[in-house]
Amino acid sequence: MLDSAIKDQLKGLFAQLEAHYTFDIFVHPQHESRAELVDSLEEVASCSDKLSCRLQDSEGLKFILLKEGKDTGITFRAVPGGHEFTSLLMAVLNADGKGKNFPDEFITRRIKALQGPISLTTYLSLTCTNCPDVVQALNMMVLLNGQIRHEAVDGSINEEEVERMKVQAVPTVFADGEQIHVGRSSMGDLLEKLEARYGSVELEAVETKEYDVLVAGAGPAGATAAIYSARKGLKVAIIAERIGGQVNETMGIENLISVPQTTGKQLAQDLKKHLAEYHIDILENRRIEKVEVAEGMKVLSVKGGETYKAPVSVSYTHLRAHETVLDL
């Protein structure tokens, strides 16, 4: 059950909804989780007149997110509690064009260029801290590319299927029955794997962008270099697969001076928030494929065809642990 404080927060979140959304529920009358699923979704739906539930008897347990009566392509075969409650909320908000987790224009173009149809399934646990990032990234791809569908499946209530698919860890992602990923991931990494599996429509060439400083890697050191450069009035871009870098893999951090205790995920969020305070282009979900020097400029090429150049590049990547490379 949701307490009054959470309900008030949900009412505030959903107050901005423009379209109407339906949780289209299909569940067996005798399913042990039927009451929990129906009660939880009805409770969420009660927080906005833009949300409703429709219940139908069926085999198993699932619900599909509908927008104005049409299938969005997002399905949950789970009771979205625990860490996946946020995934449910983000699915609704993102379907309405809301949220701060939308990828930038170039990543969006790459997602839209994926050749479908693509059917994705993510096996998860409601206690898994790595699962929501994967679920939310794939749901975002569904909303941006109508050729993609995604099911989020709770292994604890689909044990026979988990055993049949030989799932050993969560999250595990299957693409049309083929396992393509296991464990923590980012949107950029998942996108690369889908591009390799399905191919993409060729994108138009993108003009090389020029900066004063390019920072490769967005851990604490890379973020620091970008912020210090921006404070000097320089035009700066930071390029990384994900903000925070390896920090995201750390559960507890207690050796960051002036901060007695934090988590890797929280520190990564704080780094991104701090970077956003300055005129820094944050180029996330990108893997640098090539670095070269041309006419006195450092040129960085990333997966997907983008190129960037600057007279100065600073590298704080994890290819060689804790190594800093400064090119002047």
Model-predicted regions and their roles:
Residues 16-39, 114-144:
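Local sequence-structure signature of Cys/Sec-based thiol-disulfide redox active-site neighborhoods
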Residues 32, 37-40, 248-307:
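N-terminal Rossmann-like dinucleotide/flavin-binding domain of flavoprotein oxidoreductases
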Residues 318-328:
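Single conserved hydrophobic/aromatic residue that forms the stacking wall/gate
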Residues 216, 308-319:
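Short hydrophobic core segments
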Residues 57-74, 164-175:
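Structural micro-motif
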Residues 50-58, 147-159:
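Thiol-based oxidoreductase modules, predominantly thioredoxin-like and allied folds used
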Residues 122-126, 164, 208-278:
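Beta1-alpha1 glycine-rich phosphate/pyrophosphate-binding loop at the start
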Residues 69-98, 176-199:
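Non-catalytic, surface beta->alpha helical segment in thiol-disulfide oxidoreductase systems
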